[in-house]
Amino acid sequence: MKTLYNLTKRNCRLFFKDKGLFFTSLITPAILLVLYITFLAKTFKDSFLSYMGDFPMNESLIDAVVGGQLISSLLAVSCVTVAFCSNLLMVQDKVTGSIKDLRITPVRTSALAVSYFCSTAVATGIVGIVAFGLCLLYLAQMGFYMSLLDVLAVLLDVVLLTLFGTALSSAVNFHLSTNGQASAVGTVVSAGYGFICGAYMPISNYPDGLRKGLSFLPGTYGTCLLRNHALA
């Protein structure tokens, strides 16, 4: 257990010591929030108003629904994409040869793997909590409506999706051995995951075959959890 703790501590230190990697992970949710507010907020609002037709609706209620949609989309995407960025240390150790030095020591391979998982979960969790704080500030500007129980439920969803993103990134990055491969995978995940998990577009808008295929992916249910609790 002490070995696992020391390895996890080492990985966390290396992550936070790399200012470029840390600030890239930290600023990603903020950039996404700005993009969502700029481009998606009006789209969501127009969509809701079109469904309501001539039915009178309080403007603050519409803003609350739009805010819930935006923060759930942001958190659903960030918890996974940031995990891939945080888990780059696994690839960097292979590139620099540090993994060979670690493997010749009397450290179990399982302890080494779990240390990468734990450090990635910690780093991603910190960024996820910061992102959630930014989302709460945005809701405060729009008109805060969430109860303490709702906030705790969303926070629990963030933890759950952080663990999912960490597991997914660990399974993928385990097979990567160069920075080019890691960059390519990160680009694909950042560009496509939001569509796959239903954050950018509702799954119901997809063709029937694609919709059934996406229903087998755990990420879609993580987005649903966040939507249910953010719009409760």
Q: What kind of feature is each model-predicted range?
A:
Residues 10, 14-48, 67-82, 121, ...:
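Hydrophobic alpha-helical transmembrane segments of multi-pass membrane transport/permease proteins
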Residues 47-62:
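Perimembrane loop-to-helix junctions flanking transmembrane segments
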Residues 34-43, 173-227:
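Transmembrane helix segments
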Residues 1-9, 165, 210-216:
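Short, membrane-interfacial amphipathic segments enriched in basic
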Residues 31, 35, 62-141:
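Hydrophobic alpha-helical transmembrane segments of multi-pass membrane transport proteins
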Residues 20-21, 111, 181, 212:
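Residue-level recognition of membrane-helix boundary sites in multi-pass small-molecule transporters
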Residues 7, 25-26, 74, 93, ...:
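Residue-level recognition of transmembrane alpha-helices
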Residues 109, 117-194:
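Alpha-helical transmembrane segments and their short interhelical loops
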